[in-house]
Each structure stands twice: as C-alpha cells, then as structure tokens.
Amino acid sequence: MIVGVPKEIKLQEHRIGLTPDSIRALTKKKHEVLVENNAGFEAGFTNEDYLRCGAKIIGTPEEIFKKAELIVKVKEPQMNEVEMIREGQIIYTYLHLAAAKQLTLGLMKSKSICIAYETVTDEEGRLPLLAPMSAVAGRMSIQAGAHALEKNQKGRGLLIGGAPGVDSANVVILGGGVVGENAAIIATGMRGNVYIVDKSKKRLEELHKQFGDKIIPTESDKTDLKKLVSECDLLVGGVLIPGAEAPKLVTKEMIKSMKRGSVVVDVAIDQGGCVETSIPTTHANPTYLVDDVVHYCVANMPGGVPRTSTMALNKATLPLLIKLADQGYKKTLKENKNYLAGLNVYRGKITYKGVSNSLDLDFVDASKLF
C-alpha cells in the first residue's frame, strides 16, 4: 500500500503522523511511504532520517494526496486538505468531528474512509489511541495553568505550590480519566491543593489509592460544583464523552463567581469544551479573559511538545496502521469491532453515533456496511 504523510498545517501544530521508526516498520513490509519535504523538522526528524528508513521525500502535499492510498496525519484535515482528499482514500488521524460540522460535511462529500484515533477502543472500552495525547495534554494543562497564574499573564500572581508559610493554590480537575490523572500527577508534584471531580465513585477510589492524601476525591453528584469552582485558583476541564461533544459542566455564572486572575484550562476544547465561556485558541495566542478569569483553550496542546507527542502517539497508532496497510480496511475493520469503532465517516455516511447525534446528521451502522 502507498502511505502518505503530509506536513501538518494547523496553526502552531508541529507534530508529524509517523516517526522514522514507524516508517521503517512499514517499508520492511514492502509498503511505500511518501513524506512531505521537511514535515518532521519541527519534531526533530530530518528528511535524511526518513530517507534512511526507506521513505520517499515528496515536495508538495498535492502530490502526496494524489498518490497515497492511505493518509496518516495527527490533526483533523484542514479545509484546503479536504479538497485534496480522493474518493476511497483512507484518512487515519484525530478527527474530533462532533464539534466540526463543516469539516464533517466536507469529508462526507469526499467519499473517503475516515478512521478517528479518538474513537478506536480496546477490550475494556478504553480509548488507547487517544490516551497518549490525553496524558500529554493533562500534564501540560498544569504547566500551562501555572504559567497563566503569573501576574504578567494577567493571573492571580500565585505559585501553585505556595512557599514556606504560604498556602498552596487550589487546583480543581474536572474528570478523573487519563487527562485528569495526568494533570494530578503534575499538580500534586507541584504541591497544589488538588481536587479531582468525577461521577464514578470507583474511579475516585482508584485515584485515591494512587495519590493518597495528595488529592481530595470529589463525587460530582455529591458536591456543590459552583462553590468548588468559585474557590479554586486553577480549573482544569478534562471531561470526555467518546466521540461526542463535551458536556458544558461549568456555566457562565460559575465563571463570574471565580476570583479575579483565576485560570481555566479547558483540555476538552477539541470536543467543544466543558466550560461555557471556552473558545478555541492557539499556541500563538493561547489565552483570553472573560470576567477577569484567564482562559487557556489551545485546541492542540500536545503540538507544543511535538517530539514527545509524536513518539508517544506512534506507539499507539502503529499496530492498526500496519493492519490497514497489510490487509486493507475492509478486512481489518470487519474482523475487529474495536477498530471498527474508529470509523467515523464512510463514503459519505456518518458511522459514529456520537458524531451524528452532536451534528444532527443521519447515522449508518458501520457493522452493516461490510
């Protein structure tokens, strides 16, 4: 199979779909891999690195989209990329379609086969291709939040860990999943007062066992979320409904109740955000103010650490990619319901329920297509 790796063109996105090691794994199996010129440069991978692993360097994205049977990316196709997608071409990347109707309609029109990293499951119902970037984003959320709390960033002028004789900052993490757990790793390491809010008592017990008294586990149904939000210094939104738009847990009124200079980091912004006042931002202009509360809503947080992110992502995405290349998408998806869960758009049809519900578009059961 001919596999294409175009350069990411989303603003401030520096990751690349495949590392040289991943390409070596494909070329050893006699697959042809086309990499756009300097596509991996910002992630620390040179053209020479890719050539040594058997890739061919291609000058333009147009040529890659024209020749490749399968396109591997990191972020969702931008609209000028959508125009290059061919009928029957496989697109393998993060899509986050539930909050992107124009993109979804464009992919439907292209009649391509779109497999979303974020909805592929495993036997336990987890999201193994989303997990590595959720882990990175969770860790970055505290790093970004700590910086935004500084006075010259319009924050409260607080250090998360306080100082001798000075209280630590209150950190509230919404969601105890991969994002929340990894945010807690960094927040507790910085000695913040860390609250993790989740609806699952079992999950909170697991986190309490992991972190001990370093966190305050909080059941969402048994707490006054408005009070908790009003008293926090840093709020991290890490709530996820797989493949669907994130629930708006924090209202505009709650934001108004927060202290001047408090910080919101909405990691769920890729799926629309879990805070009513959140709008997507970029690494170039990451923050804005609403009611004197600093909002950090970068939609591709892991793109800021592209080398770490690309290597972590490839460890998760490569096994399915090799199967797709070796035996084609029909056999691969038909034989494995967890892989089939990744199919979001198939030749003009929406095949993921969360996307169809969020965008009010017709749904077709993917299991009946092959």
Q: What are these model-derived regions, one by one?
A:
Residues 70-148:
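Phosphate/diphosphate ligand-binding glycine-rich loop within oxidoreductases
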Residues 118-159, 168, 269, 274-370:
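Adenosine-phosphate binding glycine-rich loop
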Residues 67-68, 232:
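An anion/phosphate-binding loop that grips the pyrophosphate of nucleotide cofactors and donors
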